[in-house]
From Swiss-Prot:
One of its GO terms (biological process) is carbohydrate metabolic process. Glycans are attached at N154, N181, N337. Its EC number is 3.2.1.26. The keyword Glycoprotein applies. Disulfide bonds join C435-C481. Keywords: Disulfide bond, Glycoprotein, Glycosidase, Hydrolase, Signal. It comes from Pisum sativum (Garden pea). SMART domains: Glyco_32 (SM00640). The active site is at D61, D140. InterPro entries: ConA-like_dom_sf, Fructan_Metab_Enzymes, Glyco_hydro_32, Glyco_hydro_32_AS, Glyco_hydro_32_C, Glyco_hydro_32_N, Glyco_hydro_beta-prop_sf. Belongs to the glycosyl hydrolase 32 family. This is Beta-fructofuranosidase, cell wall isozyme. Residues 1-22 form the signal peptide. PANTHER family: BETA-FRUCTOFURANOSIDASE, INSOLUBLE ISOENZYME CWINV1-RELATED (PTHR31953).
Length: 555
């Protein structure tokens, strides 16, 4: 196999089984966002440098992202008093580019009976005339989950620094009449305006083990009435947290996004995403929105399989999208929890980050969504490094030098010329289990091949991101894994391996891998964004300049 160009965005192609050619280009490092993000301190080897992360304390769900007044606004669940969950407020940051963020004062904090015990997740909607409104879940004195509204105090302030709550709060609440579970009624979506002039919003809920998205309607965005039936529900899925419902363009080669209120057109399909509380993963369905019956109808293949597809097959939850009307794209943000122990989080003084914002759109096949880091992240790239073409044989590991191995953006493409030695899968198996059984140290017919990230001298520690190819029912099946089983000598960490199958035919197209590396997070995008896997890792040896980045090909 041969390498031809590493960019950091490390680009290289590999032809497998026999020696192959490849190219790779590398940017030597990704610029650290600002001094308060810097993780160069020996005492903070795991603080990220270019991911969204507060200076200290606990962060979880992204809330109410929107573009207003020339700024991107991001609100988020935050504990101002510590590095564990509790005392939740809506913190607020703004950005011009979705990469460099400036923190502002907290936007929403407990102050009314309807939210006195917490201001939980919700969404922002831009009303006619360009006025933002936030619907969010509050916890009342009885620990009931209710829905509230807040609007800006000063519409002329592009930073939206102050918000006021309605005296009519709560606008939606569980009652004896509606029989809604008061402990399972949260996370309102971005609202959409129907052609009948009514606003609609979804609230996540459940009845026993049936998860559902309860639908409410309003003419004035204040007086809401529950619809006769949920927009959608599914038995055995448990509580639906952080639902998201939005249109996507069919056959969208330009990756264009559309406004949330776009519906009923022939070129539009809809996505229903839910964060399943039982599994702590974000799943989605693709289907159509029946605007007459007010129901979501999953397409063939999604009905029987249920919530099989996921945004990200690693550590990723409570995501939220918004339509960026400035660039006609839909942006996805998600929360990445720690894999360290609570005791270690308290010692660090912080917990949780957000992924790099991703563009999201419908793949041309119509069978799944595609995600890719926003273009703006490329402005952080520095110092390109170019490698001449190299031949790599099976069993070789090549160090990628001249780069900052703990803070990088790597792109690779693999080209396979011979699949005669692929392993056979006799029966279907869960890909995450398969990644655990056949990790980076287990040789196969074709694979594993990919990257070793945060690798220590002697490989006592490393995180592996790799592909492996199988034959299943006379078709080639590509497995993508993020193997954390040897990521740290600290056994208190969660070192679960993750993975998924990638819908790529390796005979007719290259296998691409892009990996964003940032001190304790590894975001990987396979098949040009058709599969995403995020990992949190905390090596004890492979930190700072002791960490190595390697290309590996074991077969």
């Amino acid at each position: 196999m041969a390498i031809s160009s590493i960019f950091l965005l490390s680009l290289f192609s590999l032809i497998y089984v026999i020696p192959i050619e490849a190219t790779h280009h590398v940017y030597q490092t990704l610029e650290t966002l600002s001094s308060h993000h810097s993780s160069k301190s020996n005492h903070q080897p795991y603080r990220t440098a270019y991911h969204f992360q507060p200076l200290k304390n606990w962060i979880n769900d992204p809330n109410g992202p929107m573009r207003y007044g020339g700024f991107y606004h991001l609100f988020y669940q935050y504990n101002p008093k510590g590095a564990v969950w509790g005392n939740i407020v809506w913190a607020h940051s703004v950005s011009k580019d979705l990469v460099n963020w400036t923190p502002l004062d907290h936007a929403i904090h407990p102050s009314q009976p309807s939210d006195i015990k917490g201001c939980w997740s919700g969404s922002a909607t831009i009303l006619p005339g360009g006025k933002p409104a936030i619907l969010y879940t509050g916890i009342d004195p009885n620990n009931h989950q209710v829905q509230n509204i807040a609007i800006p105090k000063n519409m002329s302030d592009p930073l939206l620094r102050e918000w006021k709550k309605s005296p009519k709060n709560p606008l939606m609440e569980p009652t004896i009449a509606n029989k809604i579970n008061s402990s399972s009624f949260r996370d309102p979506t971005t609202s959409w305006l129907g052609k009948d002039g009514f606003w609609r919003v979804l609230i996540g809920s459940k009845i026993d083990t049936k998860g559902m998205a309860i639908l409410y309607k309003s003419k004035n965005f204040v007086d809401w009435v529950e619809a006769k039936h949920p927009l959608h529900s599914a038995e055995g899925t448990g509580m639906w947290e952080c639902p998201d419902f939005y249109p996507v363009l069919d056959k969208n080669l330009l990756r264009t996004g559309v406004d949330t209120s776009r519906n009923g057109d022939d070129d539009v399909r809809h996505v229903l995403k839910v964060s399943l509380d039982d599994t702590k993963h974000d799943h989605y369905l693709i289907g159509s929105y029946d605007v007459v019956k007010d129901v979501f109808v999953p397409e063939n293949g999604f009905e029987d399989n249920g919530f099989v597809l996921r945004y990200d097959y690693g550590k990723y939850y409570a995501s939220k999208t918004f339509f960026d009307d400035g660039k006609n794209r839909r942006i996805l943000l998600g929360w990445v929890n720690e894999s360290s122990s609570v005791a270690d989080d308290v010692k660090k003084g912080w917990s949780g980050i957000h992924t790099i914002p991703r563009e999201i759109w419908l793949h041309e096949s119509g069978k799944q969504l595609v995600q890719w880091p926003v273009k703006e992240i490329e402005n952080l790239r520095m110092n390109p490094v170019n490698w001449p073409t190299k031949v790599i044989k099976g069993g070789e590991r090549i160090s990628i030098t001249g780069v900052d191995s703990v803070q990088a953006d790597v792109e690779i493409s693999f080209e396979i010329s011979d699949l005669g030695k692929v392993e056979s899968l006799r029966k279907w198996i869960d890909p995450q289990l398969l990644c655990s059984q056949k990790g980076a140290g287990v040789k196969g017919g074709v694979g594993p091949f990919g990257l070793l990230v945060f690798a220590s001298q002697g490989l006592k520690e490393y995180t592996a991101v790799f592909f492996r190819i199988f034959k299943y029912q006379d078709k080639n099946l590509v497995l993508m894994c993020s193997d954390q089983s040897r990521s740290s000598l600290n056994k208190d960490n969660d070192m679960t391996s993750y993975g998924t199958f990638v819908d790529v035919d390796p005979l007719h197209e290259k296998l691409s891998l892009r990996t964003l590396i940032d001190h304790s997070v590894v975001e990987s995008f396979g098949g040009e964004g058709r599969a995403c896997v995020t990992a949190r890792v905390y090596p004890t040896l492979a930190i700072h300049d002791k960490a190595m980045l390697k290309l590996t090909s074991e077969y």
